[in-house]
């Protein structure tokens, strides 16, 4: 009995329509630290979508919110987005190993094809 109710509830939730959370964009600078990450992502996506339109038709509050998210303490210029030398070095080494291995495999494959053709000519 408990399993059927759980399945019904799950189906009911999966068939329901999505309702985005209502957040006042006018207070985005104060509300931003308290918002859940999912809500933050939705606000960012909404503002990106709005900024694709003609900016003359976008309300001033939304323009200010987009500016805050782009240039404020939470955007790409935040302290958490500083360049990390160790991480960058490890990414370079990883990519060199990855693409070096792929290049070596491709070179060996070409050499094997040439060797195979030479062996066919001998027979």
Swiss-Prot record:
Pfam families documented for this protein: COX4
Domain of life, source organism: Eukaryota
UniProtKB keywords: Mitochondrion, Transit peptide
Gene Ontology terms: biological process: mitochondrial electron transport, cytochrome c to oxygen
UniProt cross-references to Gene3D superfamilies, sorted A to Z: Cytochrome c oxidase subunit IV
Subcellular location: Mitochondrion
Keyword Chaperone: no
UniProt key word Transit peptide: yes
Organelle targeting sequence: 1-37
Predominant subcellular localization, coarse grouping: mitochondrion
GO cellular component term, pick one: respiratory chain complex IV
InterPro entries: Cyt_c_oxidase_su4_fam, Cyt_c_oxidase_su4_sf
Function: May be involved in telomere capping.
Note: Present with 1170 molecules/cell in log phase SD medium.
Protein's name according to its UniProt entry: Maintenance of telomere capping protein 3, mitochondrial
Organism: Saccharomyces cerevisiae (strain ATCC 204508 / S288c) (Baker's yeast)
